[in-house]
Structures are given as C-alpha cells and as structure tokens.
C-alpha cells in the first residue's frame, strides 16, 4: 500500500469546507457524494499534515496448520511513521519499526519474519473511501437511522478493476468491505476489507502461488500530535485462510497501537574555543 501525498494535497483547500461538523450539523443526512468529499478532505489533511511520529506497537501473529505445530509469535516494538522527502520535491510516508522483544525476550535481530505480517495501513489505508477512488470502486451508503444520529455512517464498497484504471487504484486485488464514519467529524472510525482471492505467496516456474481469503480490519481513534489532531490506527486485525476442510491453514495478525508521539528534531550549537 502506497501513500500518494503529492497527488491529493492540491484539493485540500477546496474540500475542507465539506469536512468535519459542517456535514453532521446539517438538517438532512448528507448524501453519499458529500460523505466521500468529507472523507477526501480529511484524507488530504492527513497526507499533507500528519507529522513524523512514533508509538508503541504490540503485535501477535500465528499460523495454524493441520498436522503441524502451531507457530505463534509476540513482538513488542516502537513503530515509526516518517515523512520522507522524494526527488520530485514531494514527501511520502514510510513505515518502520524497532523491535524491542520477541516472545518476551530481548530482540537480537530486527527482521520481523512472521508468521503473518501486514504493512502499509498507516501510509494509505484512509484512501480506500475517497472521491479519488470512485474510478476504482462502487460505493453505496447504508440506510441511516435518523432516530440515532450519533451512529456511524456506513459506506459499502467493492472494487471495479480494469486494465485501464488498475494503475490508479489503491486496492490491487478484487475486494469489498465497509467504512464506518463518525458523523461529527467525517473521520473513519473503522475500516473492513475482505479479499476473497488474496495472493498469499507468489508462484514460480516450479510451483503455483498460494491463494486464500483475507479479512482485514482497522480501528481508528483521535490522537493529538503537536498542534494537530489526527485519527490514527488503534488496532489492526487480519485473518487469512487457505485450503478447505482438514487442509485449512489459518494465518492471523493482531496489533494494538498506543502512546503516539510526534518525532521532534532537535539541534545543539557547540561554540568553538578561541
């Protein structure tokens, strides 16, 4: 998953007027188009403004296969999201982590080798539902219960991938899912993506690839970073299954994120001696 900071930042000023409480405070329920514009505005705000940051990441992953010993791993890490300059004078968001421990023991290496891994959510997960992605998605707004105005709006989506649009699409595999949106801020509270035929492992000249069903969820919560307020992942879950019956293999990944901090760049001037 790749962030596209440079492409979307231009629309920030135009769309901000439709974001936040403006939509939620109106007399009528916003249309699907208005909700997508609000999501796009918040996405642009995130892309243009989220600073380099770090937080605590506590992740558990497992692989369960019939006839094999279960493989479980727990990692405790410092997760980092760094805003990195590019040659074309734009910036991109790059994920990394410093692993502190594996299964409760101090880490002797920094390679996170599974059994289940996930990356890219911080870089571009919010792009799944946006005006920009209408060329790649079919969106529909779930019926809103007007007696419960504080309940999240729910937007359903399904990919429409073609040879012509695939290069512009955030999701590169046929998928469907739901986005739960806070009415007061037009921020994403929860994202769910189901990919029925996810490529788990690429094939080769000697073996076919491993394909399975992947179910992914991301919960978001507001975080104050310096003077800015951003909705960041608080929990990420993934479950992938391959095979059927007694031959079913299950991979799972679950991570929680806490204690967000903005990266501070400090400098110190050393005065030379006369």
What residue spans do the PLM features occupy?
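Structured extracytoplasmic
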Residues: 25-176, 183-189, 194-274
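Bacterial N-terminal signal peptides that target proteins for export
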Residues: 1-11
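N-terminal signal peptide c-region/cleavage motif recognized by signal peptidases
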Residues: 19-21
């Amino acid at each position: 998953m790749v962030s596209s900071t440079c492409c979307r930042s231009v629309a920030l000023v135009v769309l901000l007027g439709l974001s936040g409480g403006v939509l939620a405070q109106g007399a009528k329920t916003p249309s699907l188009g208005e909700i997508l514009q609000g999501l796009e505005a918040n996405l642009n705000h995130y892309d243009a403004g989220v600073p380099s940051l770090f937080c605590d990441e506590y992740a558990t992953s497992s692989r369960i296969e019939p006839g094999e010993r279960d493989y479980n791993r727990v990692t405790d890490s410092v997760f980092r999201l760094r805003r990195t300059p590019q040659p074309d004078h734009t910036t991109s968001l790059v994920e990394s982590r410093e692993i502190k421990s594996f299964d409760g023991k101090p880490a002797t290496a920094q390679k996170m080798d599974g059994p289940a891994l996930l990356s890219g959510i911080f870089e571009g997960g919010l792009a799944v539902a946006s005006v920009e992605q209408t060329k790649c998605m079919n969106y529909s707004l779930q019926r809103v219960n007007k007696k419960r105005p504080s309940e999240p709006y729910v937007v359903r989506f399904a990919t429409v991938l073609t040879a012509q649009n695939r290069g512009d699409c955030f999701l590169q595999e046929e998928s469907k899912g739901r986005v739960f949106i806070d009415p007061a801020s037009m921020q994403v509270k929860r994202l769910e993506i189901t990919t029925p035929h996810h490529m788990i492992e690429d094939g080769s000249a000697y073996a076919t690839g491993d394909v399975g069903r992947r179910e992914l969820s991301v919960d978001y919560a507001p975080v104050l970073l310096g003077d800015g307020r951003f909705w960041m992942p608080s929990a990420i879950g993934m479950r992938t299954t391959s095979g059927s019956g007694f031959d079913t293999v299950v991979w799972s990944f679950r991570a929680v994120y806490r204690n967000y901090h903005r990266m501070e760049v400090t400098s110190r001037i050393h005065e030379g001696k006369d």
